[in-house]
């Protein structure tokens, strides 16, 4: 398994996982645009030529925001999400990342556990933020100012 910055060719595999995992899947074009845009914070895990996980976000130093973290269902519970997130954060630190935000569905317990294990702290709630199904968004932050090591 290899981790890398996403390349345009990864957009097809990322879009396929989006469709499989998310009810509000991003389009192939949206994914490719973010991969190719300056400030795009996009990373992919590849196993046997297959996209098995990705992190998509944006970096406008010193802040970054993660929009998506996804792992193929048949590859979960193996630490891939944690390791890819770690790779993304460490790589982005070299571009001036100091604070990293994300939002997660309140009912997405596995994702919340991953983010907490990686050092994110809950800093707020956005009531009824998500639709289909309706859910609150938990806003999380990981920052140097919280004495966390990137």
Regions found by a protein language model. Give the residues of each.
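Non-catalytic, surface-exposed connector residues within folded enzymatic/regulatory domains
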Residues: 25, 78-79, 134
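Acetyl-CoA-dependent GNAT
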Residues: 2-74, 85-91, 95, 143-149
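Non-heme di-metal
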Residues: 43, 49, 70, 118, ...
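Conserved glycine-rich acetyl-CoA-binding loop
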Residues: 50, 72-86, 93-95, 99-100, ...
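Short secondary-structure transition/capping segments
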Residues: 38, 69-70, 112-114, 134-137
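Conserved catalytic-core motifs of GNAT/GCN5-like acyltransferases
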Residues: 60, 103, 116, 121-137
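C-terminal "cap" of GNAT-fold acetyltransferases
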Residues: 98, 105-109, 128-150
């Amino acid at each position: 398994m290899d981790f890398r910055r996403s390349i345009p060719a990864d957009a097809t595999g990322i879009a396929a996982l989006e469709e499989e995992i998310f009810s509000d899947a991003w389009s192939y074009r949206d994914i490719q645009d973010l991969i190719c845009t300056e400030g795009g914070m996009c990373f992919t895990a590849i196993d046997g030529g297959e996209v098995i996980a990705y992190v998509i976000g944006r970096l406008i130093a010193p802040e970054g925001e993660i929009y998506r973290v996804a792992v193929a269902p048949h590859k979960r519970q193996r630490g891939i999400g944690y390791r890819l997130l770690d790779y993304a954060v460490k790589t982005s630190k070299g571009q001036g990342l100091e604070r990293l935000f994300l939002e997660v569905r309140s009912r997405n317990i596995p994702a919340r556990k991953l983010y907490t294990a990686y050092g994110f702290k809950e800093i707020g709630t956005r009531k009824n933020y998500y639709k289909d199904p309706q859910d609150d968004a938990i806003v999380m932050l990981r920052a140097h100012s919280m004495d966390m090591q990137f």
